[in-house]
Amino acid sequence: MREAVIAEVSTQLSEVVGVIERHLEPTLLAVHLYGSAVDGGLKPHSDIDLLVTVTVRLDETTRRALINDLLETSASPGESEILRAVEVTIVVHDDIIPWRYPAKRELQFGEWQRNDILAGIFEPATIDIDLAILLTKAREHSVALVGPAAEELFDPVPEQDLFEALNETLTLWNSPPDWAGDERNVVLTLSRIWYSAVTGKIAPKDVAADWAMERLPAQYQPVILEARQAYLGQEEDRLASRADQLEEFVHYVKGEITKVVGK
């Protein structure tokens, strides 16, 4: 199954890795494919997720050239018949090994940055609490396209740090403007955070949605069901029309997560 999914995007993957190697050799230590491609299967709007590890920081010329070239290998979900959205996260080895929280991210590229990139705006290196979650994902499920396996290269992220990152993420969503236009992703991400808070593991979005469905009061189940079906391409996404129900869902699930990870 995993090999078939990777084969489905092999041409695009080769192009992306080629761009990374061209700009980052000889400082390149590893490239890991993680996310839906290797855990649960690519869905209609799934990204291709790559974690790249290098030995030194990027100079500004390299950063800009790499990002501009990555832009040519990626497309926003639904905009291309042959290209998927690509998300590339780059870390410097000594910033994350040995592990400490919060860790520093050297670079991140994704379709949400496209307009900024085209306008000449490039995100600098920054502290990123999400690296605790990302590295946990990579250690649990990934394929090394370059370099050693993730579980050999990276230290385990302590559960306390994972919980802290999950808890920090919850602060992003407090009122409807915080999820406007991104309703499906927020519903599914909250389900994954809830799953991770309870189990200490990370699951694909649809698996976490099924898990959450079994634990939700009946009045919130239509929200997660619609998000799941839209994610799988089985139903149109109409979550924006469920404004009151959606807000109640968000606050309920945040409350359940907080019971587990604390405040």
UniProtKB/Swiss-Prot annotation:
> Which processes are annotated in GO (biological process)?
response to antibiotic
- Effect listed in the UniProt record for changing residue 128 to E: In transposon Tn21
InterPro entries associated with the record: AadA/Aad9, AadA_C, NT_sf, Polymerase_NTP_transf_dom
Q: What Pfam families does the record tag this protein with?
A: AadA_C (PF13427), NTP_transf_2 (PF01909)
Keyword list (alphabetical) reads: Antibiotic resistance, ATP-binding, Nucleotide-binding, Nucleotidyltransferase, Plasmid, Transferase, Transposable element
Gene disruption: observed consequences:
Loss of resistance to streptomycin and spectinomycin.
Question: Catalytic activity annotated for this protein?
Answer: streptomycin + ATP = 3''-O-adenylylstreptomycin + diphosphate; spectinomycin + ATP = 9-O-adenylylspectinomycin + diphosphate
Molecular-function GO terms, alphabetical: adenylyltransferase activity; aminoglycoside 3''-adenylyltransferase activity; ATP binding
Stated EC number for the protein is: 2.7.7.47
The EC class name is: transferase
The domain of life for this entry's organism is Bacteria
Q: What does this protein do?
A: Mediates bacterial resistance to the antibiotics streptomycin and spectinomycin.
- Name listed for the protein in its UniProt record: Aminoglycoside (3'') (9) adenylyltransferase
Native organism: Escherichia coli
